[in-house]
């Protein structure tokens, strides 16, 4: 079951991309990692967009403690897997648009189960992209400045 934010809103997180432990890269799903300064974002996997270098990229986005590797002891992190993208964007500031929640966080028995689910999440994100106008959340881009790592609701365009 998928959940959308109440129309006409999406959540936008602005943050600097930090180097992580490279685990996503080693299992075939590299991510742009943004620290989350506070609670308020719903943990789970989302379909959305990442603004980077003046371009928009579809992304499967995870927010949570990364329970497969760290249990509840891991610090919260936003990890965005940009589809069809392989550039190094460490230390760049990006905007991450959380548009549709795909599922909650869960712990997997191991890496094979996790990678199978990540592949399904990417497929679900691609399916979502086919139903969304690429410019929909950006047609009336908000003129807001937010602290790094803080999410703000933004009105979606019609």
What does each of the following model-derived ranges do?
Residues 2-158:
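Phosphate/ribose-recognition catalytic cores of enzymes acting on nucleotide-derived substrates
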């Amino acid at each position: 079951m998928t959940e959308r934010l109440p129309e006409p809103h999406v959540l936008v997180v602005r943050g600097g991309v930090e180097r992580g432990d490279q685990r996503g890269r080693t299992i075939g799903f590299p991510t742009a990692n943004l620290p989350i300064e506070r609670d308020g974002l719903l943990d789970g996997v989302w379909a959305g967009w990442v603004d980077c270098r003046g371009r928009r990229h579809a992304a499967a986005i995870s927010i949570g403690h990364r329970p497969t590797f760290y249990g509840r002891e891991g610090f919260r992190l936003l990890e965005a897997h940009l589809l069809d993208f392989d550039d190094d964007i460490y230390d760049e500031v990006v905007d991450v648009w959380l548009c549709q929640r795909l599922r909650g966080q869960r712990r997997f028995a191991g890496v094979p189960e996790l990678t199978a689910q990540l592949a399904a999440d990417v497929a679900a994100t691609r399916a979502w992209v086919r139903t969304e106008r690429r410019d929909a959340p950006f047609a009336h881009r908000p003129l807001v400045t937010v602290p790094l790592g803080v999410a703000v609701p933004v009105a979606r365009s019609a």
